[in-house]
């Protein structure tokens, strides 16, 4: 029997959640060989990258371009702040590497289009982190495909996080400064509620929306034609101060007359 290939993976920043490179490292056919980031990133970025590289006994190099050219990689794992996802993924694709990236794909639609073009142009694969293969989702898909629940006409997903997001809405006293988004996210890293890590504030629809939207797309197998969404800030002072949502509802019209809806939010201890 031919020996299975081991794929060499480079981690392009690992400053947010590190579950993505850890998942890759846990697979027997993947090997993490290097962590890389751009030299002009702030100190906290380099510190987190170095800590992860040290844990896995691999080098941390402050030169993404050099690593892409010189380390004989098969794929890149992108786990930076959301606003840098597309830039790093495009650079990896242009270097001929397959890409596994953390969500969201980007905070801007134009950047998503650029990434899709780069993937197609270079004939590489792109995988965005998702939860489509959780047991409950698989069971739902089997029930739909088997006809056990009849013909699908409508689908709804509730997706809420109970992770905290700092002080509750309304707790900031007169004269207190607004909560700084990046500082709050850096503090939240310890308990895993830093999904919006980055300079640019992000609401929950941006941070977590891929999950329920991914479920709907997978379970229906059809495209969305019309969307109506509404966002609000009900729970967390950091979201109020930075003008981003912590609760959202979305209504969808899909092909074949199917309608979809989702509710999503980070409700903390509410």
Residue ranges and their predicted role:
Residues 56-118:
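Beta-loop-alpha module in the N-terminal Rossmann-like domain of NAD(P)-dependent dehydrogenases
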């Amino acid at each position: 029997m031919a020996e299975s290939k081991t794929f060499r993976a480079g981690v392009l920043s690992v400053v947010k959640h590190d579950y993505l490179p850890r998942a890759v490292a846990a697979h027997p056919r993947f090997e993490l060989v290097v962590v890389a980031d751009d030299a002009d990133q702030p100190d906290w970025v380099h510190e987190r990258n170095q800590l992860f590289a040290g844990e896995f006994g691999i080098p941390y190099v402050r030169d993404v371009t050099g690593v892409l050219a010189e380390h004989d990689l098969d794929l890149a794992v992108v786990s930076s702040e959301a606003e840098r996802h597309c830039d790093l993924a495009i650079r990896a694709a242009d270097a001929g590497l397959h890409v596994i990236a953390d969500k969201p794909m980007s905070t801007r639609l134009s950047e998503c289009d650029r990434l899709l073009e780069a993937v197609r142009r270079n004939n590489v694969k792109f995988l965005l982190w998702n939860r489509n293969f959780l047991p409950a989702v698989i069971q739902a898909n089997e029930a739909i495909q088997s006809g056990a629940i009849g013909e699908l006409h409508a689908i709804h997903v509730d997706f809420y996080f109970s992770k905290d997001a700092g002080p509750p809405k309304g707790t900031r006293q007169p004269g207190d400064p607004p909560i700084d988004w990046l500082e709050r996210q850096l503090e939240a890293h310890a308990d895993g509620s830093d999904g919006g890590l980055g300079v640019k504030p992000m609401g929950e629809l941006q941070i977590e929306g891929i999950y329920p939207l991914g479920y709907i797309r997978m379970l229906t197998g059809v495209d969305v034609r019309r969307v109506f969404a509404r966002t609000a800030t009900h729970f967390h002072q950091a979201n109020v101060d930075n003008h981003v949502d912590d609760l959202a509802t979305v209504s969808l019209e899909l092909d074949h007359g199917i309608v979809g809806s989702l509710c999503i939010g980070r409700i903390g201890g509410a």
